[in-house]
Amino acid sequence: MINNNKWLVVGLITSCHGINGQLKVKSLSDFEERFLKPGIRWLQKENEPPSKIELTSGFKQPGKETFIIKLQGINNRNQAERLKKCKILVKTNKLPKLKKEEFHLLELINLEVKTLENEELKIIGKVINLENEKNNLLVVELFKNKKKVLIPFVKEIVPLVDIKNNFLIINPPNGLLDL
């Protein structure tokens, strides 16, 4: 998610791993090197400004979308516990360059969700989050009842994404939006 037009949240620290200060991170990014390649990262605790920290190592957990990372100065479980729920950020001006029709998945958050009904576009909700354990899923809050539905982010169901105009169009199969 884009945070104050300056930061992009690329990961969430979910828990500790072991006793030597390693951290488990849920990735919100398509760029694995953010959690593998040593270097400077930014960490944000709730309601605090981001702070600089150095990633010393990282690896992807086999078969999962989570990473185990080691940060400089975090050497035991007690220190690691204090970082649970922290966000890992990158500056938006440091995002990798994409091709013309490409976009960062996190740019989908807060887009209006529209459907085509009787040749007319109808706004039905907005993207409030992403789930990406195995496949990318849009978490959409429906305006009519405030319920949350998961929409598979595949071309057949989401044929159009218009970042510039802040919306996407879905073509849901029967029953997908029924709650």
UniProtKB/Swiss-Prot annotation:
Gene Ontology terms: biological process: ribosomal small subunit biogenesis; rRNA processing
Gene3D superfamilies, per database record: PRC-barrel domain (2.30.30.240), RimM (2.40.30.60)
Major location (coarse): cytoplasm
Domain PRC barrel, residue spans: 100-176
InterPro entries from the UniProt entry: PRC_barrel-like_sf (IPR011033), PRC_RimM (IPR056792), RimM (IPR011961), RimM_N (IPR002676), RimM_N_sf (IPR036976), Transl_B-barrel_sf (IPR009000)
GO MF, one annotated term: ribosome binding
Top-level taxonomic group: Bacteria
Location within or outside the cell: Cytoplasm
Domain notes: The PRC barrel domain binds ribosomal protein uS19.
The protein, known as: Ribosome maturation factor RimM
Encoding gene (name): rimM
